[in-house]
Amino acid sequence: MRLKTDEKELLKRITYNPAIFGGKPIIRGHRIAVEHIIGMLAAGSSFEDLLEGYPFLEKADIQACLVYVHRLVAHEKIEPLLVKDNKTHYRRKK
């Protein structure tokens, strides 16, 4: 399954930094792990609950988490962006 353009744009919101949460995927610019957002959704929180609890997030950030996890489950190879020292580093596909 190929990524749609809007999904590609959403995935740009998911980054990782080895210095934050051991390199787990996070929402770009925030110390919020994708797994935290997915866990809260799985526990019954709504988008509105998350946006109220984390007012710095945007709806697209939550959607990006869902797209990211969907791609993992679908066994798609995705490459999150490495952000280190406030610089973006792209991983090379093997």
Identify what each model region corresponds to.
Residues 33-94:
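Long, charge-rich, low-complexity alpha-helical segments
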